[in-house]
Amino acid sequence: MKRCVNLDWLEVYCFEPVTGVRNADYFRSKGYTVEERDYGTRIYNEMFTIMGTDEWPLLEIRRSPKSSMTNGGIMPMNACHIRLTNRTCYYNDAAVQLQLFLDQHGFMFQRISRVDVCCDFERFDSGDYPQKFLRRYLQNKFAKLNQGRIHSHGEDTWDDRRWDSISWGSDKSCISTKLYNKSRQLREVKDKPYIKQAWLECGLIDNFYDCTKVLEDGTMHKPDIWRVEFSVRSEVKNWFVIEADGNAKKKRSVPNTLRMWAGREQLIVMFASLARHYFHFKVYKEGVRKDLLQDKELFRFRPNEETYKVDRLSSPQDEKKDLERLIAKLNKFAMTYPASEINDAVSTIVAKIEQIQLSRFAQDPYSWKELIAIQQTLAYRLQHKGIDPTSVLHSILTMLDGTVKPY
């Protein structure tokens, strides 16, 4: 079955070099664009984000501990935490990029404080649909080894009860597990284009915008993509400990260095190892010990698992910015070549954009507002050659706020 394995969180605990502090001004002096927060965190005085070469957030640094040893506290004065942004985690070599950054600026790596690895799929390798499996699990059809504490979320209607997520493990657990409907989260909480791009690259969907795919019989299908996610926290340098075969007294240490998460192949190996211990289910039978029950097979990992690679990530920008940039480029072109046929061509292109966008965003009032604003901006631009189209567009968008409703 098609599946998509990625990092979703990577954070390390480091020491700054003794040769000098690594504050926001240091990175500005090295040519980075830095966004500094006016306040720190509960543990650190400073927090700032370093932008990548594409001007999107690359990583976040928290430094200058409030409880440092020089002030009678417990943390070394040069301690810091460095976290990749969520978008950066979806690069093929995210862990390698982080290691290169640490080496380049002299940080002394201590340990991975948190790493999340996830697998997205429509169905389990066994053919089970995640929502049906989750419902049966909550009906005691299956039993899970390890992590007895659970938290589930869903929706209770008159006709049915739908479960959208479940997590195992407490807040203090070194390893926690989560199964949830990722498609629903992207629709209702926050859209992340780079995640949909990953789905497209590995074949879970065929259409980036609508998140649909064409089945073998030619019909259009909109799959619900689910995610299994393991979150690993460790207080020990280079290792984390897992329970073997559901036995709390039988533990095994697993290497936990950046090298272990360096590429897709390594991610699949680490995910499979965690799934074996923390996504291990049995077919429940009353009166029979868990370790004697029949296994419920869900994932099947092959020795040579196929992986995908992303050459360039989509930027997490909304439709408004895309449309503004497109209109600005069209108007710039029309101003450079002020011929009547150019204006006609621009009008034709915008009409085509309207046709596509109306079918895609017919229920979104913000898209309707944008399209109306584009129409009015182009009309105004054709009548007033010297006007700045961007300022007109912003003025019209502001004027239309709260007034445009979808059909």
What does each of the following model-derived ranges do?
Residues 1-311, 322-407:
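Structured, helix-rich domain cores that form ligand/interaction pockets
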Residues 314-319:
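Mobile genetic element proteins and their domesticated derivatives, centered on retroelements
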